[in-house]
C-alpha cells in the first residue's frame, strides 16, 4: 500500500486530499499544527485503519516513521488576514517547512508536491 504525507491536513484543501487519498487506497499521514486548521475537518477519519495524524509544525524537523511514497505540502496560513496576524509563522512554514520536507523527501526517496499561494 502506498503511503502519503499531507501537510496542512486540517485545512480545507488538506482535509479533502486526506479523504480522496484514503478513498483511492492509500495509507494517509496527516500533519498540521492546528494554528489555522480545524481538527474537526479530520475527526471522521480517526477511526480509519489507514489514517494517522501528527500534530506538528513543519517549520521544525519532520520525521515520519517507515516508508513514504509521496509528500503533499499544503501547510500554510491560508488567508491575507492570517498573513497579517502571523507574518513570521507564514514565512517559516513557506521557507523552513519546505526545506524540511525536501529533506524528508530525499531521505525517504519520496515524490514531493509543493502548493503555494
For every predicted segment, state its role.
Residues 1-117:
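N-terminal Rossmann-like NAD(P)+-binding domain of SDR-like oxidoreductases, especially those catalyzing
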Amino acid at each position: 500500500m502506498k503511503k502519503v504525507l499531507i501537510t496542512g491536513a486540517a485545512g480545507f484543501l488538506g482535509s479533502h486530499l486526506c479523504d480522496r487519498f484514503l478513498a483511492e487506497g492509500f495509507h494517509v499521514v496527516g500533519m498540521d499544527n492546528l494554528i489555522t486548521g480545524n481538527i474537526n475537518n479530520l475527526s471522521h477519519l480517526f477511526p480509519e485503519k489507514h489514517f494517522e495524524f501528527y500534530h506538528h509544525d513543519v517549520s521544525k524537523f519532520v520525521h515520519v516513521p517507515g516508508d513514504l511514497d509521496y509528500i503533499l505540502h499544503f501547510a500554510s496560513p491560508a488567508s491575507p488576514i492570517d498573513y497579517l496576524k502571523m507574518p513570521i509563522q507564514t514565512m517559516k512554514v513557506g521557507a523552513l517547512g519546505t526545506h524540511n520536507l525536501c529533506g524528508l523527501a530525499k531521505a525517504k526517496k519520496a515524490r514531493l508536491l509543493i502548493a503555494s499561494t
